[in-house]
Regions:
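Acidic, Ala/Val/Gly-enriched low-complexity intrinsically disordered segments
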Residues: 3, 11-14
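Alpha-helical transmembrane segments of multi-pass membrane proteins
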Residues: 14-204
Length: 204
């Protein structure tokens, strides 16, 4: 029988686990300000391609898929390619990141995410030298590729799943967590809610 006032084995285990979690350092790739910066970049790129590059959404491909289907339904096959190419570039970006991850996972001198960030910054310089109008398709393909690279590489902030190139999922999760908070009044849930809504605001 456990001595009164002393935690049981199960309680000690839970307490030790909580202390361990509190002292585990947050990875740089999951830090709040890095994710905030990436989220602002994601929001800017969506505005940039839609306003200045022919009304194409570079980040989330839902809009492009809808417009692709609409153009096909209306018989505008050639115009539909305008939306198909960014979708294909997005898919290639996902595959590219997985290749980078597999190739450099054990590389001790450089983390694979550092390679991704360097590549993203380099590629985002190119549209500045590509004239609006004549190069819109190429720019949209390039930015869709970059956004796929970002969303596949940076998927967590402080251990929580998050998206840095779109806000629908973040908005859904934050609102869902409100329901749980109203029932539990758990402080950690409240912090998660705040974090998700902050990312939505940074995207805006």
């Amino acid at each position: 029988m456990p001595v009164s006032g002393c935690p049981s084995g199960g309680a000690r285990s839970e307490t030790n686990e909580m202390k361990f979690k509190q002292h585990v350092p947050v990875q740089v790739s999951e830090s709040f300000w890095l994710c905030a910066l990436l989220t602002m970049t994601g929001g800017f790129l969506d505005v940039y391609t839609y306003v200045t590059r022919g009304q194409v959404f570079a980040n989330a491909q839902t809009g492009n898929i809808v417009l692709l289907g609409l153009n096909i339904a209306e018989g505008h096959i050639r115009e539909s390619l305008y939306y198909l190419l960014p979708i294909a570039a997005f898919a290639l970006g996902i595959l590219f990141v997985e290749w980078i991850r597999a190739r450099f996972r054990e590389y001790s001198q450089l983390h694979w995410r550092q390679i991704v960030v360097f590549l993203e910054a380099l590629l985002l310089l190119l549209p500045a030298f590509m004239v609006s109008g004549a190069w819109d398709t190429q720019v949209n393909i390039l930015i869709s590729f970059v956004c796929a690279v970002q969303v596949e590489s940076f998927r967590k902030v402080r251990g929580q799943n998050i998206a840095t190139t779109m806000c629908t999922g973040n908005l859904r999760t934050a609102t869902e967590q409100i329901f749980y908070y109203l029932h539990s009044h758990d402080a950690e849930t409240g912090r998660r809610i705040l974090g998700y809504y902050e990312m939505v605001l940074f995207f805006f």
